[in-house]
Amino acid sequence: MSEIVDIHAREIIDSRGNPTVEAEVTLASGVMGRAAVPSGASTGAREAIELRDDDVRYGGKGVRKAVGHVNGEIREALLGMKATDLAAVDGRMIELDGTPNKSRLGANALLAVSMATAHANAADAGMPLYRHLGGEEAVTLPVPMMNIVNGGAHADNSVDMQEFMILPVGASSIAEAVRYGAEVFHALKKVLHKRGSSTAVGDEGGFAPDLPSNEAAIEVILEAIDKAGFKAGQDIWLGLDCASSEFHKDGKYVLASEGKSFDAAGFVDYLAGWVNQYPILTIEDGMAEDDWAGWKLLTEKLGGKVQLVGDDLFVTNTEILKEGIDKHIANSILIKLNQIGTVSETLAAIHMAHKAGYTAVISHRSGETEDVTIADLSVATQAGQIKTGSLSRSDRVAKYNQLIRIEEALGSAARYAGRGAFKQLG
């Protein structure tokens, strides 16, 4: 009774007020799986292509074309297929699209159906998605990377770097980790208010204050950690997403807010100075996606001290990840479902990373919905780490709440990844 008997997609709205694709897959047993795809603000040049309408509706960002592909070609091709063979379903859609980057039908069309099929399979098996994808061994709750200060493409302020995160590695459970994060978030709001800084939030729910420098963002977070009663470098560590491709111009790393410009070696030294001075545990996209020589320098200098995550660098693509592994570039990959466009390919990237000794961080996008698939995915794959924003905005909090539910359902079997998620903490 696992045959696909119906597929339907619609245009819905994401957390930034832009359209996105939601799909429903119905099986012969009568169960239905539903999923909605996210969308990024800063995107890697080699990501799978998100199909937009480019007409007058929604400033050109409508997704009627992608929805039409789901309700037409994709539906016709998949009706009657066994949903339980997700790899075959995904493979059929990839074959149908016929392009290397899913540009004909749209990665947003393929991913909506792929995710919905996974949900339908889980419902048909009478189990939660994390158990269906991960089996009995899926008991590890991830350390959240909580983006509490937003800059770069995620905020309208003068901070160059995109995300300043807190990692509650010292918590004993995901529920406690969320509490740590929420208490620091509220303490930070008070710190910023006292300074006369804006407490408006960015796309991912973090504050987006105008600060005199990127380093000032670290300083206010450390103050908030202390005021909340936690110890930085023990209870809570720091993480950065530089999104360096966004300020890499003509071979230079240009921090406009500080009036500074660096070559690759200089920017590596700049980041190394921060690592030596602050309790930084992870740096994402420390170098630009096309600066592989710079990445090599960064990995050689800091790879033994901190987690170096490739996002725009690897774009959840196994071919690019393999090249990085072979060249000893970075030591971690950010996993975004919509960068590659199917669940099967996403799982393959996670498997490749883990096999090579790289960590895998499951991630949201800046444009999200109430869909919580990534929470289940983080547990299913035992990734040990998740990025899903700050402690505000329901599109972010929905994922934390799902992790709390999963932890409760697992009961005594549940394990919080904590310090064990990071080799750098021994």
UniProtKB/Swiss-Prot annotation:
Pathway info: Carbohydrate degradation; glycolysis; pyruvate from D-glyceraldehyde 3-phosphate: step 4/5
Cofactor descriptive note: Binds a second Mg(2+) ion via substrate during catalysis.
Chain residues that bind Mg(2+): 241, 284, 311
Keyword field: Cytoplasm, Glycolysis, Lyase, Magnesium, Metal-binding, Secreted
Gene3D superfamilies xrefs: Enolase-like C-terminal domain (3.20.20.120), Enolase-like, N-terminal domain (3.30.390.10)
One GO molecular-function entry: phosphopyruvate hydratase activity
UniProt main location, coarse: cytoplasm
GO CC list: cell surface; extracellular region; phosphopyruvate hydratase complex
InterPro entries attached to this UniProt entry: Enolase, Enolase-like_C_sf, Enolase-like_N, Enolase_C, Enolase_CS, Enolase_N
Record: residues binding (2R)-2-phosphoglycerate: 162, 336, 365-366, 387
Necessary cofactors: Mg(2+)
SUPFAM superfamilies, per database record: Enolase C-terminal domain-like, Enolase N-terminal domain-like
GO biological process, one term: glycolytic process
Subcellular location field: Cytoplasm; Secreted; Cell surface
Reactions catalysed: (2R)-2-phosphoglycerate = phosphoenolpyruvate + H2O
Catalytic residues (positions): 204 (proton donor), 336 (proton acceptor)
EC numbers, comma separated: 4.2.1.11
Annotated function: Catalyzes the reversible conversion of 2-phosphoglycerate (2-PG) into phosphoenolpyruvate (PEP). It is essential for the degradation of carbohydrates via glycolysis.
NCBIfam families: eno
Subunit organization: Component of the RNA degradosome, a multiprotein complex involved in RNA processing and mRNA degradation.
PANTHER family with a match to the protein in the record: ENOLASE (PTHR11902:SF1)
Family (UniProt): Belongs to the enolase family.
The protein, known as: Enolase
Annotated gene: eno
